[in-house]
Amino acid sequence: MCAAQMPPLAHIFRGTFVHSTWTCPMEVLRDHLLGVSDSGKIVFLEEASQQEKLAKEWCFKPCEIRELSHHEFFMPGLVDTHIHASQYSFAGSSIDLPLLEWLTKYTFPAEHRFQNIDFAEEVYTRVVRRTLKNGTTTACYFATIHTDSSLLLADITDKFGQRAFVGKVCMDLNDTFPEYKETTEESIKETERFVSEMLQKNYSRVKPIVTPRFSLSCSETLMGELGNIAKTRDLHIQSHISENRDEVEAVKNLYPSYKNYTSVYDKNNLLTNKTVMAHGCYLSAEELNVFHERGASIAHCPNSNLSLSSGFLNVLEVLKHEVKIGLGTDVAGGYSYSMLDAIRRAVMVSNILLINKVNEKSLTLKEVFRLATLGGSQALGLDGEIGNFEVGKEFDAILINPKASDSPIDLFYGDFFGDISEAVIQKFLYLGDDRNIEEVYVGGKQVVPFSSSV
């Protein structure tokens, strides 16, 4: 007889589950049973041979089990630790300039348009739909300096069921495109309004994040006040650091009294255990030590680092310093909205560093898979809630079908010997796309295919 106090189960799946742990970068669990409670949490993950025991404990019948096809598998939802939702309007174009010129010619004019709420709604709706469809269950979004349209992004994200951090961009310095900046007072006041109004909505999985654009667009006064807001409200923080050489030099010239780029953020209370900094290509060992001491994270954005000719992040060096790290698409400096692309580019960048004898080894695909899932969750301070299929975590997952209609993957006899092989998983990570992502779950709720309400 089953225990009466057990909560009802929303899902029971039987099949293959692929995830990471801190001791194993890719664990393939074949013929397992996974149960999801009505609250969206994983309550068991055990070998299918334990079905009778689990059925007694959790009060389910064999007919309630959904059996995956032998070629299908579940993997954790992908975590995009750095994406500019507002730049989605020109993603896939305009990447012919280095960072600072790119910001002036393309990015600031594009973001300036988001004072138009109708335009913002169209772009934000499309980017949330597109990223969810491509398996991004958690996204860390930059919006723009416009509070109302940034609040709209949070609302849209919640409506679609995506887990997210949403940041209203703060910048009170911008001589290259002066139409797109705030006064210091406006930026502080509007950030406080943004945070307050977002928190009043009580979204279950969408949170505000304090977002100074980067040191070149923020005065010391603004950075200090944003650091205080984050500290007082116990909020996450996101920004950019050491993306390209010209930027690093410009920061040195703008803030000559600081020891280095990292200290600019650190001395203004912006480098905490809730901070995620994008790029970090030129961080010194000394700076990485500070990241480790503060518990701050790095978002590795290989596509944009290559597309804007910014540099290479040495992930192995970051890991050697025990700094938390995840992957980011960095739309639109990165032209792809797909985290699968981020996985592939991260492997390639690591291979380039090996070829150039910077490192003695390269990251494996399995290690990068972990960065895109468990690593990303840790970088955003969510590894106690999501990132893999450990019991007690929320079920953020994507169902992969390598044999989907019009699949970009060709499978052969050797790919299957009764159960799914690791070759099939690798083929999906290297060759797959949204056609292979049949279903997406966030917090136990199926969000793709989309419901008629969105």
UniProtKB/Swiss-Prot annotation:
Subunit structure: Homodimer.
Family: Belongs to the metallo-dependent hydrolases superfamily. ATZ/TRZ family.
GO cellular component: cytosol
Biological process terms in GO annotation: allantoin metabolic process; amide catabolic process; deoxyguanosine catabolic process; dGMP catabolic process; GMP catabolic process; guanine catabolic process; guanine metabolic process; nervous system development
Cited Pfam families: Amidohydro_1
Name of the protein described by the UniProt record: Guanine deaminase
Phosphoserine: residues bearing it: 453
Cofactor(s), names only, from the UniProt record: Zn(2+)
Presence of keyword Heme: no
EC top class named in words: hydrolase
E.C. designation(s): 3.5.4.3
Natural source organism: Homo sapiens
Residues given in the record as Zn(2+) binding sites: 82, 84, 240, 330
Binding site for substrate: 84-87, 213-214, 240-243, 330
Statement: the UniProt record of this protein carries the keyword Transmembrane: no
